[in-house]
Amino acid sequence: MSWAARPPFLPQRHAAGQCGPVGVRKEMHCGVASRWRRRRPWLDPAAAAAAAVAGGEQQTPEPEPGEAGRDGMGDSGRDSRSPDSSSPNPLPQGVPPPSPPGPPLPPSTAPSLGGSGAPPPPPMPPPPLGSPFPVISSSMGSPGLPPPAPPGFSGPVSSPQINSTVSLPGGGSGPPEDVKPPVLGVRGLHCPPPPGGPGAGKRLCAICGDRSSGKHYGVYSCEGCKGFFKRTIRKDLTYSCRDNKDCTVDKRQRNRCQYCRYQKCLATGMKREAVQEERQRGKDKDGDGEGAGGAPEEMPVDRILEAELAVEQKSDQGVEGPGGTGGSGSSPNDPVTNICQAADKQLFTLVEWAKRIPHFSSLPLDDQVILLRAGWNELLIASFSHRSIDVRDGILLATGLHVHRNSAHSAGVGAIFDRVLTELVSKMRDMRMDKTELGCLRAIILFNPDAKGLSNPSEVEVLREKVYASLETYCKQKYPEQQGRFAKLLLRLPALRSIGLKCLEHLFFFKLIGDTPIDTFLMEMLEAPHQLA
């Protein structure tokens, strides 16, 4: 019998849920609706039945996001608009009945079970009747709920849906899964820097006030002042102040006056010997130099003292011998002439003194001439200045002549004469400089690595460093209570350099050496045999 020949009572059988193909489908659908009626008492059975008959064989439409959000269901396959058996006010076909608002759900910040951006999963069968909460919504959650938390979210999770029983396919229930709140990441915390970190305890340069890079040569200083002090010591540079020697030395004006900057380096406690020890340690690592402890043996101060005493005795013999210019009665009255004659006489003894200084004779002959030519004026000034310690307002020449301050002023050399008295003679008298210290200062002047024309300046510099070390050791042993004595001795070197240059102007003006070039004279003296042996 065909479906068209069915008797007209078939719809009644369908409505009663009896057998038949369409009736089977309606029977299944009505069974689902009956379960919905038991879970949703506010739905009207009459309205649901009328909607089921009117809908015929149409499939149940999928819930909209808004409806799913109000019913608390997501991708579980349940539809809040399922037709029921009856309704007092039947709606037109295809128009879903309005569902009453359900009880408000607590806000959930738990991440969704589905992947982000994935298509919605297929519908699932309804959960068991005893499930207290619906299945957690997927990534296509309702717009009424807050979006899922980002991966880096570190806030607490407080949703009762997390610990509820999750429905599994087939109507079974899985064990409850406790989702622990994520651990608070370190990026969300603000940790203050430790008190001993790199930002604490910043020191400033003791010379200019710039940021200090550490302790250099005994003082916290910046890289600029460290390099300035090292260059000054290694090259034995001398500076002069254009003002009153009280210039401001700070970060902006530290390069304005090198003299005041160098004096401030010494005043703050920078040690010249530390520069020499630093270079010596570098040579020890390379195996090219001796240790700092061996420097006094390489440049013994007793040999330097012997050289000073030998030259002094030779000068006394020349004064007392026949033909000597000693004695104030036989000397001319012009102080400039007396100084020129004494300087000419001292040039010979100066060469003999240099030959007695350790390691000087081992240098090439041309280098010996260059060193004597570069420092002969300072060497002679240092010698007669120390000889004049016991003389008041005057200097004592090697010929035994005494030149008074008034005579120098009358001859037109009073300005440079006063500088010799105040910057050299007076300072040597105050600190009671002995002959060993004088000999070491003169040896430092002699070994000048900055003299132009040297074949091996580094060798000369090594000899100067050995003199530095020997003099420092001598000061510590002879004057242990005077810790700054070594520095005071070295401070006389810039004054000697400045006064020596000024004296050269006067001496060349008065034609000290006449028509004989100084290079030829020194060469002849160096080639002569050692007469003071």
UniProtKB/Swiss-Prot annotation:
InterPro entries: NHR-like_dom_sf, Nucl_hrmn_rcpt_lig-bd, Nuclear_hormone_rcpt_NR2, Nuclear_hrmn_rcpt, Retinoid-X_rcpt/HNF4, Znf_hrmn_rcpt, Znf_NHR/GATA. Residues 67-82, 276-288 have a biased composition (Basic and acidic residues). SUPFAM superfamilies: Glucocorticoid receptor-like (DNA-binding domain) (SSF57716), Nuclear receptor ligand-binding domain (SSF48508). The modification Omega-N-methylarginine is found at residue 25. Residues 205-270 bind DNA. Keywords: Cytoplasm, DNA-binding, Metal-binding, Methylation, Nucleus, Receptor, Transcription, Transcription regulation, Zinc, Zinc-finger. Residues 1-204 are annotated as: Modulating. Expressed in aortic endothelial cells (at protein level). Expressed in monocytes. Expressed in a variety of tumor cell lines. CDD domains: NR_DBD_RXR, NR_LBD_RXR_like. Its main location: nucleus. Residues 296-529 form the NR LBD domain. Residues 1-23, 36-181, 276-299, 313-336 are annotated as: Disordered. One of its GO terms (biological process) is in utero embryonic development. It is found in: Nucleus; Cytoplasm. Residues 89-109, 118-131, 144-153 have a biased composition (Pro residues). GO terms for molecular function: chromatin DNA binding; DNA-binding transcription activator activity, RNA polymerase II-specific; DNA-binding transcription factor activity, RNA polymerase II-specific; nuclear receptor activity; nuclear steroid receptor activity; retinoic acid-responsive element binding; RNA polymerase II transcription regulatory region sequence-specific DNA binding; sequence-specific double-stranded DNA binding. Homodimer (in vitro). Heterodimer with other retinoic acid receptor family members. Binds DNA preferentially as a RAR/RXR heterodimer. Interacts with NR1H3. Interacts with AKAP13. Receptor for retinoic acid. Retinoic acid receptors bind as heterodimers to their target response elements in response to their ligands, all-trans or 9-cis retinoic acid, and regulate gene expression in various biological processes. The RAR/RXR heterodimers bind to the retinoic acid response elements (RARE). Composed of three domains: a modulating N-terminal domain, a DNA-binding domain and a C-terminal ligand-binding domain. This is Retinoic acid receptor RXR-beta.
